[in-house]
Amino acid sequence: MLNQLAIAEVGNPMLGNIIVVSGSFLILMFLLKHFAWGPISDILKKREDKIANDLDSAEKSRINSAKMEQEREQQLLASRSDAADIIKNAKESGELSRQNILKETQEEVARLKSKAQTDIMLERDTALNSVKDDVADLSLQIAAKILNKELSPEMHESLINQYIEGLGSSNETR
């Protein structure tokens, strides 16, 4: 091979250089293809796959983040709604309690008023009965004193008439 190169160089020095450079280039290309091109291609393919995966992962993360933000917003709205419901229920419960307390108080006042009126009526009736008993006792004492005295026929007739008139007026009032 060297002999041929030497012959080619003797005839045309430029042609020999072209052949040597071309041969060297072809050998270099063969070596690069055999030893470097596969690993370089693999590295580039891995890099391409990694970039694609990173882009997919970033897109999934963005979608997941948007979904989580939407869920958080929904939870926040639900929490606000729950809080509003709790406040509404507390107000309604408070109003109901207030109305119940007011109703119970009014019923207690009415019951106490009725009991007081009943007690007053009982006391009045007791007092009237006591007065009637006192009047009856007093009347009996007066009658006993009068009976102990000697009655004249005129007094006797007057007492009988008064008694009859008293019976008549008491029957008329009934």
From Swiss-Prot:
CDD domains on file: ATP-synt_Fo_b
Topological relation to the membrane, as annotated: Single-pass membrane protein
Claim: Cell membrane is one of the keywords in the record: yes
Main location class: membrane
InterPro entries given in the database record: ATP_synth_B-like_membr_sf, ATP_synth_b/b'su_bac/chlpt, ATP_synth_F0_bsu_bac, ATP_synthase_B_chain
GO CC terms: plasma membrane; proton-transporting ATP synthase complex
Spans traversing the lipid bilayer: 18-38
Pfam families: ATP-synt_B
Coiled-coil regions, chain positions: none
Keywords: ATP synthesis, Cell membrane, CF(0), Hydrogen ion transport, Ion transport, Membrane, Transmembrane, Transmembrane helix, Transport
MF (Gene Ontology): proton-transporting ATP synthase activity, rotational mechanism; proton-transporting ATPase activity, rotational mechanism
Tree of life domain: Bacteria
Keyword hit for Cytoplasm: no
Subcellular location field: Cell membrane
Assigned protein family: Belongs to the ATPase B chain family.
PANTHER family on file: ATP SYNTHASE SUBUNIT B, ATP SYNTHASE SUBUNIT B', CHLOROPLASTIC
Subunit structure as annotated in this protein's UniProt entry: F-type ATPases have 2 components, F(1) - the catalytic core - and F(0) - the membrane proton channel. F(1) has five subunits: alpha(3), beta(3), gamma(1), delta(1), epsilon(1). F(0) has three main subunits: a(1), b(2) and c(10-14). The alpha and beta chains form an alternating ring which encloses part of the gamma chain. F(1) is attached to F(0) by a central stalk formed by the gamma and epsilon chains, while a peripheral stalk is formed by the delta and b chains.
Function: F(1)F(0) ATP synthase produces ATP from ADP in the presence of a proton or sodium gradient. F-type ATPases consist of two structural domains, F(1) containing the extramembraneous catalytic core and F(0) containing the membrane proton channel, linked together by a central stalk and a peripheral stalk. During catalysis, ATP synthesis in the catalytic domain of F(1) is coupled via a rotary mechanism of the central stalk subunits to proton translocation. Component of the F(0) channel, it forms part of the peripheral stalk, linking F(1) to F(0).
Protein name (database record): ATP synthase subunit b
Native species: Enterococcus hirae (strain ATCC 9790 / DSM 20160 / JCM 8729 / LMG 6399 / NBRC 3181 / NCIMB 6459 / NCDO 1258 / NCTC 12367 / WDCM 00089 / R)
Gene: atpF
